[in-house]
Amino acid sequence: MGQTKSKIKSKYASYLSFIKILLKRGGVKVSTKNLIKLFQIIEQFCPWFPEQGTLDLKDWKRIGKELKQAGRKGNIIPLTVWNDWAIIKAALEPFQTEEDSISVSDAPGSCLIDCNENTRKKSQKETESLHCEYVAEPVMAQSTQNVDYNQLQEVIYPETLKLEGKGPELVGPSESKPRGTSPLPAGQVPVTLQPQKQVKENKTQPPVAYQYWPPAELQYRPPPESQYGYPGMPPAPQGREPYPQPPTRRLNPTAPPSRQGSELHEIIDKSRKEGDTEAWQFPVTLEPMPPGEGAQEGEPPTVEARYKSFSIKMLKDMKEGVKQYGPNSPYMRTLLDSIAHGHRLIPYDWEILAKSSLSPSQFLQFKTWWIDGVQEQVRRNRAANPPVNIDADQLLGIGQNWSTISQQALMQNEAIEQVRAICLRAWEKIQDPGSTCPSFNTVRQGSKEPYPDFVARLQDVAQKSIADEKARKVIVELMAYENANPECQSAIKPLKGKVPAGSDVISEYVKACDGIGGAMHKAMLMAQAITGVVLGGQVRTFGGKCYNCGQIGHLKKNCPVLNKQNITIQATTTGREPPDLCPRCKKGKHWASQCRSKFDKNGQPLSGNEQRGQPQAPQQTGAFPIQPFVPQGFQDNNPHCPKCFRE
């Protein structure tokens, strides 16, 4: 890239010097870096461009067309290239005549050499004098009578004209005459714009260099410090300094500063200082009216409210979102909230938005809840101290005073905010077709359902069924513990009623239940079963009551009162304690009748009864006894083997 820039700079050195001096004479400064970038793009997409350069306006128009074609094909053209091309094209327009265009090669050869050598010098006076002597005089004097300064100003300073909202006015009110063949009388034309002979004749007169200077209303003025910005916002940057006063004669007398738009700026400043930043938002806008007859000085101008309807694209997006996701889906709630808080919506806007997006049944629900919310808000307005002068007709956009769009556009900001809150609340209560809103008591957490999902369902149901915000918060905090599964309840129980003031209870519950149901939680539950320790480090104890003494913490078989009673009963019934070890298990001093051991001292299992009687013979049952089967050969008393004994 460095080699390419150096090649471009050496290739178009004289032409670059000429362009820079030409633009500088016109009051525009362009850096060499930007010019090199421009010629790099020109060399890439316009290979026909001559090395010696050209001053033909047709060639520069052709460059613009080819760069546009390259941009349409996907090539990236930097913005600085377009700016520099437009400035050079505008600077060359005054020098075009009906004759053939002038090329840099038409100038004397010494001009090109001197311009190339002297551009490296730091002295600005020497550069300007060389330019005036060799280039500026023969070129600029050739078409002095065809200079259109209005067009040049409009092209070079388009952004400044847009900010002021006014076209170029170089002549004051008293001098607004059509230009003739000569822009100025002969006596007022700078010396450098006269033919070269005049320069030689007037040797005693000091040369006055031409330099275009914008009128006063187009000069840069630093912005004032911000007095109505956001809290803590630093003052606006001052930017660069205003243009210095040029040491040359002005081409035109200074025009009076434009006052167009100043009334609007004063109204905007006043409204912002009063905190009314929403008065200028879409779709209702306020525009200043011209002062009428008899208006006094200092009196604020009247404003006219103008209404602009919603775009078709916005209504289409709302309709598709409601159809695809539902009116109360997170996407639709976010979209509706951004529209409501980003624009100044009047009752007519809410009605159009609901009619175009919702089905007939859903719109009927919206209208019903809207009217219900208006009645509640009117009661609050009347009970306020002092009462708020906003009635039901204004909040609904009906009646003789608020039925038209022009009347609703003049509503106060407080009424706009109340309409917004009521309509958002009514939208949240819309139910999908075929679905019913369950009670918050029936919303319970599943055994494997994550706790945040359960809380989200609970909040959604509570928001639709409970209107009061404080009551809704209390109900959600209560049901978030009562309707949770046992695992989450055990994790939340230590936090119940102990959350510090200022902290969100639901957020603390969600943190406590984080990880429940995962592998880590299952491993901890297994460790609890083995060690008898819960998550909080407390020892697991039996929570029921003993059936013997009624105490909590042990079972009946382990009841100390029952064991003490058994020992007392044995001592009173027998009159003496066991003399020796138990004859049954041989490992305890107790009577054999009270032995409950299942193993003896050697670890052998003990049966229920230690001593059993002799086994009894089987008894015959039935009317006919069963004869045993005796094989043949064994029927005699002395059977003999057929192999060992013979008859």
Swiss-Prot record:
Any GO molecular function: zinc ion binding
GO cellular component: plasma membrane
Membrane topology: Lipid-anchor
Stretches with biased composition (Pro residues): 232-247
PTM info: Myristoylation is essential for retroviral assembly. Alteration of the glycine residue leads to a block in the budding of particles and an accumulation of Gag inside the cell.
Keywords of the record: Cell membrane, ERV, Lipoprotein, Membrane, Metal-binding, Myristate, Repeat, Transposable element, Zinc, Zinc-finger
InterPro entries: B_retro_matrix (IPR003322), B_retro_matrix_sf (IPR038124), Gag_p24_C (IPR045345), Primate_lentivir_Gag_pol-like (IPR050195), Retrov_capsid_C (IPR008916), Retrov_capsid_N (IPR008919), Retrovr_matrix (IPR010999), Znf_CCHC (IPR001878)
Subcellular location: Cell membrane
Top-level taxon in the UniProt lineage: Eukaryota
Polar residues bias locations: 604-622
ZnF start-end (CCHC-type): 544-561, 580-597
Region (Disordered): 165-264, 598-641
Lipid group attachment sites (N-myristoyl glycine): G2
Lipoprotein is among the record's keywords: yes
An individual GO BP term: viral process
Listed PROSITE patterns: ZF_CCHC (PS50158)
One Pfam family, short name: zf-CCHC_5
Note: Insertional polymorphism. Provirus present in 16% of tested individuals. Intragenic, in first intron of DEFB107 gene.
Family of the protein in this entry: Belongs to the beta type-B retroviral Gag protein family. HERV class-II K(HML-2) gag subfamily.
Domain remarks in the Swiss-Prot or TrEMBL record: HERV-K Gag polyprotein contains regions homologous to the matrix (MA), capsid (CA) and nucleocapsid (NC) proteins from infectious retroviruses. Evidence suggests that HERV-K(HML-2) Gag polyprotein can be cleaved into mature MA, CA and NC under certain circumstances. However, the exact boundaries as well as the size of processed Gag proteins have not been precisely determined yet.
Biological role stated in the UniProt entry: The products of the Gag polyproteins of infectious retroviruses perform highly complex orchestrated tasks during the assembly, budding, maturation, and infection stages of the viral replication cycle. During viral assembly, the proteins form membrane associations and self-associations that ultimately result in budding of an immature virion from the infected cell. Gag precursors also function during viral assembly to selectively bind and package two plus strands of genomic RNA. Endogenous Gag proteins may have kept, lost or modified their original function during evolution.
Name the record gives this protein: Endogenous retrovirus group K member 8 Gag polyprotein
Species this protein is from: Homo sapiens
